[in-house]
Amino acid sequence: MSTGLQKGSRLMENRSPPSSFSIEHILGLDKKMDVASSPIIKHHRPWIECSSKVDGTFRQIPLIYDLPVQVDAMRRSAEEETKIRLDRGEEERLTYKREQSWYRGRRPRTAFTRGQIEILENVFRVNSYPGIDVREELASKLALDEDRIQIWFQNRRAKLKRSHRESQFLIVKDSLSSKIEE
């Protein structure tokens, strides 16, 4: 054996234990851990986790954001992942549509009854900018949240503005078309 190889082999034998800053230590490769008992870090990303109904039962689409603490835990088979997902309780599952709505930051639409709309329209004719006290009174009488009433008035004012703009456009259009015909 050459002297260079002998020195290299002696250096490897005298090697100190890996430091706590080594890649192996940081990734946890220096520790042997059972894959089944390895904890999983699960980030809260409900817009990725979607349920789909197949054969009358809900099956979850496999997630890609389950990050194991130990790199060895990444070797779980697809069957194990599917089994874990199917074992979850029904209460944890949401429909695809609801999850997508949540992702967009929307709340479910408020369905106003005819009676509620009539009362809101009557108040709007009198005052299109009701104060907080009027909105709170309406909320208690109509069994709605005050913020829903505030949004209704905002939407109604936008509708009025839009219809006014459209009527102004039609007036201008009619006057221009009559001048062109002359």
From Swiss-Prot:
Signal peptide range in chain numbering: none
Upregulating conditions: By Ammonium chloride.
SUPFAM superfamilies hit by this protein: Homeodomain-like
Pfam families: Homeodomain
DNA-binding span(s): 103-163
Tissues in which the protein is found: Initially expressed in the anterior dorsal region of early embryos and later exclusively in the primordium of the anterior pituitary gland.
Cellular compartments annotated: Nucleus
UniProt GO BP: pituitary gland development; regulation of transcription by RNA polymerase II
Tree of life domain: Eukaryota
GO cellular component: nucleus
GO molecular-function terms, A-Z: DNA-binding transcription repressor activity, RNA polymerase II-specific; RNA polymerase II cis-regulatory region sequence-specific DNA binding
Major subcellular location class: nucleus
Alphabetically ordered keywords of this record: Developmental protein, DNA-binding, Homeobox, Nucleus
PANTHER family: HOMEOBOX EXPRESSED IN ES CELLS 1
Family statement: Belongs to the ANF homeobox family.
Identification of the protein by name: Homeobox expressed in ES cells 1-A
